[in-house]
């Protein structure tokens, strides 16, 4: 595809070349006169070649009016804007939007009355989220501090009460506790805070124990504070350190992070100074071995200090340590452009050697002494850290710092038994320790097969009985089967069978072979294992039996081969719906089974709650299209309850839109009206169940296109492609209206209000849709104002609805809606006047209007609060009370 795009760009360039040179037949003198202009044009062509191919296609689409309109017709641009962004919480806004920082920057710079940042909690979430140390983040914090400080020159009155410089201590404390070096550094520079002030904050607000449980972030901020001389003497990283070595020294860490962690740790303390202090306090006895280890550590630190990060390639730095040691990452020198993959020895070449080699243009004369073995470097890092902890932790805590199994696997050549003794038995190993040990040993390609056989035999013979408990056998079984090594599995099964033959059946210790194979079939990751079971253990297990349910466990990548093996002996798979809807892959399996009725038998007898959770869980996993495919082809025994469609509060409510469009594609407002009329007739007898009964809809669907090849489809007897099917579902009136709202069918909602006011405006339907708890979560300022205008124009029975909408507008801070009401020439401003005996044209009493203002104060939108206080005819005492509330929050 890339080549095709490049060809197209070259063709475009060639076309331009021909256009520029179309006067080649002119006289030579004319050519010379045009030569500067030709050169200028050719220079433009060269810059054009630097454009990414995808950008060419973007502009082709962007300039095509028809395609452009079609794409942007899916965006509700007039409905959503800054006025609909309320607060910047960490989950839904900061991490839920890829451009959240840009939105905040734009909102601040726009001097808009509607500020997204509403309170200190929003700022704390920002500090917790944006920590990257780059120019963009630094500029962002400078802008933030400038905007929210007492010296701000913004012409707009801030709706928020935040003033960074009015409580310097509190914000320093928050930035340290959120380990945000970037924000703290910019904060100190912006407000020109001296080191003594920071020390004072540390002494009062940050306990020395804060650095006791050390993470990478805490090491980073500790060293930063130390570098600017802002650490009080009471705050020492050591001996309070209690680092989680399992995380800190994990071989799954990226190499570059591991190097940084090492440097942060070593830089955080002066070993010699600490040793001298401990000697003075009599805490450290000078023993020859201690001195030897201390000298060894210093020597390793010196050696590692000579190694520069620039000597490693980007591939190496971005790889995990485990991958580097397993030789699965391409490695290359830091200067040469060629990359070579190694399988025996990982090396880097010193920059000095590279420099000399490049100057001499001779890559064959590299001094072998200048080559550094990467494995040795990694080993030095680990040994240095282990020695470091030996000298810095309290004696009573030294027992928790043990070397991990992977350290012995990669850096020490020891027997399996000896490694078990070191990393498991010595520490009275937990189930997790056993799990890690067995899986690592059995999957390690560098350990001889005979040693693995011996391990299996020792476990089955209870050689590890000291720490190996009965239920730990299942951990071992899983480790064997997850190895996906046919030789190991075969050896294990034969030994199990042999042990069972020598035992009394009633007290057999281990499960049957057939049960073991089925219990762990979800671990099979290659066809050869399936073939092995099929050829050798087919009669001893249920894996390939007729109507077996093991298809639920087989990995999707292998399911086709499993179907082939099962079908080759005339058997079918069975897929029961009950209890399996929570499996992440169940919907994919279900769709596959529906399309292959000759291979699967399916029972759709699950309850409505089963189907609800199936849809719920898969919407959360971005599988809207799979759900649609399922609904298009499934044969339900009863209408499906889809009340989940009305979910407005779930974090994935927006993902439901695709499904809602699919279901309501051919359901007109007239058909909805007919259904509601039937519901309305049922309400006359005031029966609760009937009044709140669900509405049943029928939508027309087309069976999904089969994903299998035509030949395979013919073999398994797939459903007819393109066949029209009917699908019945039920929803409540509330959910119906929420769905119409989400589909931008607000006109249809108003149509239904007009046609069936008795349905929506009766007291027992007062909780439907327009209640504050429901409309609050989904309404934009644009549509909320539409509803307000509609209720104003139809005041017969809509006063309650109108009031709820005004409360929502106030709480969300939609200032413009109230400005429009106040400036309206349609005499709607009376809505914001107090109803009295002499003024019956108003709708709301003093308490109701007071509550509207209270909501704006609670949301910290003081501009709106002051607007309403000044306009509503409160008493002088009432105005003063509301203004005092504002002052208390400022």
From Swiss-Prot:
Residues 1-39 are annotated as: Disordered. InterPro entries: UPF0746_actin_org. Disulfide bonds: none annotated. It comes from the Eukaryota. Residues 1-35 have a biased composition (Basic and acidic residues). Belongs to the UPF0746 family. This is UPF0746 protein DDB_G0280811. It comes from Dictyostelium discoideum. The lineage of its organism: Eukaryota, Amoebozoa, Evosea, Eumycetozoa, Dictyostelia.
């Amino acid at each position: 595809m890339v080549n095709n795009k490049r060809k197209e760009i070259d063709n475009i360039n060639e076309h331009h070349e021909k256009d520029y040179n179309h006067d080649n037949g002119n006289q030579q003198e004319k050519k010379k006169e045009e030569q500067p202009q030709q050169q200028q044009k050719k220079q433009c062509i060269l810059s054009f070649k630097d454009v990414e191919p995808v950008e060419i296609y973007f502009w082709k689409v962007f300039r095509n009016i028809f395609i452009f309109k079609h794409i942007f017709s899916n965006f509700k641009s007039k409905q959503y804007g800054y006025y609909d962004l309320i607060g910047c919480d960490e989950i839904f806004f900061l991490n839920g939007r890829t451009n959240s920082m840009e939105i905040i920057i734009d909102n601040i710079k726009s001097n808009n009355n509607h500020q997204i940042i509403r309170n200190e909690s929003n700022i704390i979430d920002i500090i917790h989220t944006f920590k990257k140390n780059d120019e963009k983040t630094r500029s962002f914090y400078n802008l933030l501090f400038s905007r929210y400080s007492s010296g701000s020159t913004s012409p707009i009155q801030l709706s928020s009460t935040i003033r960074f410089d009015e409580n310097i201590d509190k914000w320093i404390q928050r930035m340290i506790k959120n380990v945000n070096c970037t924000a703290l550094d910019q904060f100190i520079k912006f407000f020109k805070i001296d080191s003594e002030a920071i020390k004072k904050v540390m002494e009062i607000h940050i306990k020395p124990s804060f650095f006791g449980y050390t993470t990478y972030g805490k090491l980073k901020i500790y060293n930063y504070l130390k570098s600017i001389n802002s650490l009080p003497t009471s705050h020492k990283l050591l001996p309070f350190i209690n680092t989680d070595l399992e995380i800190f020294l994990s071989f799954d860490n990226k190499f570059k992070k591991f190097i940084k962690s090492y440097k942060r740790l070593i830089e955080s303390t002066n070993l010699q100074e600490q040793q001298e202090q401990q000697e003075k306090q009599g805490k450290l006895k000078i023993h020859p071995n201690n001195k030897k280890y201390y000298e060894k550590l210093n020597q390793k630190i010196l050696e590692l200090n000579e190694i520069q990060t620039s000597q490693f390639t980007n591939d190496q730095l971005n790889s995990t340590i485990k991958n580097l040691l397993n030789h699965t990452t391409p490695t290359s020198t830091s200067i040469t452009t060629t990359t070579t993959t190694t399988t025996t020895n990982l090396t880097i070449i010193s920059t000095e050697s590279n420099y000399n080699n490049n100057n001499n243009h001779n890559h064959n004369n590299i001094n072998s002494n200048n080559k550094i073995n990467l494995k040795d470097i990694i080993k030095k890092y680990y040994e240095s850290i282990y020695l470091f902890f030996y000298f810095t932790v309290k004696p009573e805590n030294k027992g928790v710092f043990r070397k991990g199994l992977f350290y012995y696997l990669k850096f020490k050549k020891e027997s399996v038994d000896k490694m078990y003794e070191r990393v498991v038995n010595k520490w009275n190993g937990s189930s997790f320790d056993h799990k890690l040990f067995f899986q690592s040993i059995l999957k390690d390609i560098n350990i001889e097969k005979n040693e693995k056989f011996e391990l299996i035999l020792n476990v089955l013979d209870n050689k590890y009985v000291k720490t190996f408990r009965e239920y730990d056998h299942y951990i071992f079984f899983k480790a064997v089967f997850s190895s996906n090594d046919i030789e190991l599995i075969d050896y294990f099964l034969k030994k199990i069978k042999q042990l069972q033959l020598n035992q009394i059946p009633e007290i057999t210790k281990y499960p049957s072979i057939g049960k073991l194979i089925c219990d762990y079939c979800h671990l099979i990751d290659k066809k050869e294992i399936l073939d092995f079971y099929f050829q050798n253990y087919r009669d001893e297990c249920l894996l390939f039996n007729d109507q077996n349910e093991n298809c639920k466990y087989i990995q999707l990548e292998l399911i086709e081969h499993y179907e082939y093996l099962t079908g080759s002996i005339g058997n079918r798979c069975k897929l029961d719906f009950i209890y399996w809807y929570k499996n992440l892959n169940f919907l994919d399996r279900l769709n596959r089974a529906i399309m292959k009725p000759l291979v699967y038998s399916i029972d759709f007898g699950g309850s409505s709650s089963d189907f609800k959770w199936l849809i719920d869980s898969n919407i959360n996993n971005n599988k809207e299209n799979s759900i649609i495919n399922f609904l298009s082809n499934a044969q339900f025994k009863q209408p499906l309850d889809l009340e989940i469609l009305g979910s407005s509060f779930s974090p994935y409510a927006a993902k439901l839109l695709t499904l809602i469009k699919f279901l309501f594609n051919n359901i007109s407002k007239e058909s909805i009206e007919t259904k509601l009329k039937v519901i309305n007739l049922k309400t006359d007898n005031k029966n609760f169940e009937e009044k709140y009964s669900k509405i049943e809809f029928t939508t027309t669907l087309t069976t999904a296109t089969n994903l299998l090849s035509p030949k395979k489809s013919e073999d398994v007897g797939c459903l007819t492609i393109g066949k029209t099917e009917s699908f019945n579902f039920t929803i409540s009136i509330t959910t119906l209206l929420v769905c119409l709202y989400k589909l931008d069918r607000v006109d249809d909602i108003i149509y239904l209000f007009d046609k069936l006011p008795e349905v929506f405006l009766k007291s027992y339907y007062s909780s439907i849709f327009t209640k504050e708890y429901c409309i609050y979560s989904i309404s934009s300022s644009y549509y909320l104002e539409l509803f307000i205008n509609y209720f104003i124009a139809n005041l017969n029975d809509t006063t309650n609805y109108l009031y709820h909408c005004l409360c929502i507008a106030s709480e969300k801070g939609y200032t413009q809606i109230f400005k429009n009401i106040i400036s309206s020439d349609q005499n709607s401003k009376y809505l914001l006047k107090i109803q009295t005996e002499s003024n019956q044209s108003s709708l709301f009493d003093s308490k109701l209007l007071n509550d509207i203002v209270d909501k704006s104060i609670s949301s910290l939108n003081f501009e709106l609060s002051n607007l309403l206080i000044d306009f509503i005819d409160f008493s002088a005492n009432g105005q003063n009370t509301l203004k005092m509330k504002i002052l208390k929050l400022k």
